[in-house]
Amino acid sequence: MSAAGAHRGVTPEQTLARVRPLLPRLGITRIAMLTGLDVVGIPVAAAYRPNSRSIAVHQGKGATLAAAKASAVMEALECWHAEMLEPVLRLATAGEIVRHGDALDPVRLPLTGQVDPGTARLLWTEAADLGTGRPVWVPFELVSADFTVPAPAGFGVFRQTTNGLACGNARIEAVLQGVYEVVERNAVARWHAATPDAQAARGVDPASADGAASRWLLARFAGAGVAIRIWDVTTDIELPAFLALACDADGVAGVEPEFGAGCHADADVALARALAEAAQARVTRISGARDDFPQHSFDPAMRADRHAAAQSLRRSAPTRPFRAVRSQGSAEADLDHALRLLAGAGCAQVACADLSRPEFGIPVVRIVVPGLEGAWEGAAA
């Protein structure tokens, strides 16, 4: 297991060496280190793709400079793949597509609420059911990351995000990361939808975290005088998931308060991911170089509300200690474990669309799980 907490077959340095020749094809014009924009010191990088069809700036973080760079470039790479798809598609209603094989139930997927998914003619593409290995039709809108307009026929039914999009040096890495992400986004959305009392009941004492990865990150925040609040947002799926809030301890409206979230079979890794993402979110906000920030987020009144809400959350007392949960020992075992937990929570159907391109040779997938909430609308997707 790497310092970043995930099962990796190669080092970040090897990953960078592998993808560097691909940068021109991906449209990446530069990679920037943004760590020094903030006081925390957790490495954060950005990869820039000016002609992207989704977002033009991709962030990455890690325990080292190389890990942060690799994270940013791999995020750019997976988005490029999801933008440039050339699959076989069918335009059909949910009732029509099942004549051609198994299909996901559109009613159980994240909807815009603007169109009836039961009667709308949707674009469908084939994926694989990870539980059965059989082909399954998935709405193409939940696979594509081409956000350009006008949208194709059959779009507008689902919330189009990058949720479940993942890549890795091996296919198992990509699939596992995609599964973790959809579980994480579901957990965070459910926490935000809960009552204030229910949210507060999930508070975790940062001092009780005993894992090496999370302790190192917590020390960086503490040394910089940045307050951290943690919530255990694990759902009935029982895969450890955490939400972290980083905000200025004195409450002065300086750097925006930012959330980070993480999920993993190992609770320490899940918490470390949440903390690292909170650090990344701070740097991203400081840099201003993220093209999916909503315009209203820069409004002074909105910023004041965010600071007030963050301070209120920070002052609520933790109610539980960190609970260590260990991984299964390998990526393959962790994936089997995750699929069993999903099935036990009523989400047995886990679709995996393979977006890999032979000329790149890097596994890229999109995971779609009916029954899970999509990305919380208050966060970048």
Language-model features, listed with the residues they occupy:
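Helix-biased "structured C-terminal domain" signature
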Residues: 1-381
